[in-house]
Amino acid sequence: MEELHDESLFSTYLKAHELENVFHQKLISHVSLWRYEQGELICSKGDQREHLYLLVKGKLKIFTTTKEGKTFILCFKHPLEAIGDIEYVQQTDMVNTVEAVTEVHMLRISHQALMRHAKDDPRVLTFLLKGITNKFYTKSNDLSFHLLYPVEVRLASYLLSVLTGDNSASALRLTDSASLIGTSYRHINRVIQQFCEKGLIERRRGKITILDREGLLEIAERNIYE
């Protein structure tokens, strides 16, 4: 994680996502641009709320941990996506864990600055309301809904989300992947073998490579995590 002191890039993101119409100049002075590497955590469930993050480049993975210690994936997010908005409104600790799937760029502003300079700003409040409403509107695609799908669909969707680009390859820990999509190591291993036999993916030296992205899309029907 590092702060990017690039005023040109900062302005480009503000214009691209029409954030100049949301944040007034005094508030913009409290916004900073940050870069996170692939696999880096933006926040963890239970962390003390501190910032509102706005994803302006890259992809995020959002997952949660149950009381029993099991970790399940909830969804993947693309720009423009807010992290920490619900926590700001509810004044609660972070409710989910958020990880960078690719290199990501995020705008960041402290909750204190929001409270001090935008507590009653209708533009900011409308922006937050729209984002939170959309999250609740799409809640039908939550964990319980995902688990209704066969493991084949869940795995195909997961691979499409974490392996970006055609013929992309990555080293995936099958135990972690199985936990995230809510199945066993043995089951996910069998499904991966089936995908290999169908020529959809290749597994070699611990890495999985997508060979037939369209074939995986057919199995996924639609990507249930995005």
Regions found by a protein language model. Give the residues of each.
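Cyclic nucleotide-binding regulatory module and flanking cytosolic helices
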Residues: 1-38, 77, 82-83, 87-89
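Cyclic-nucleotide recognition modules
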Residues: 23, 73-130, 137
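Glycine- and acidic-residue-biased ligand/ion/polar-headgroup-sensing regions
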Residues: 39, 50-62, 79-80
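Short phosphate-coordinating micro-motif centered on Lys-Gly-acidic
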Residues: 42-47
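Structural motif
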Residues: 59, 103-105, 207
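Polybasic "coupling" helices that flank or enter modular domains
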Residues: 101, 119-185
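Phosphate-/nucleic-acid-contacting segments
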Residues: 151, 160-226
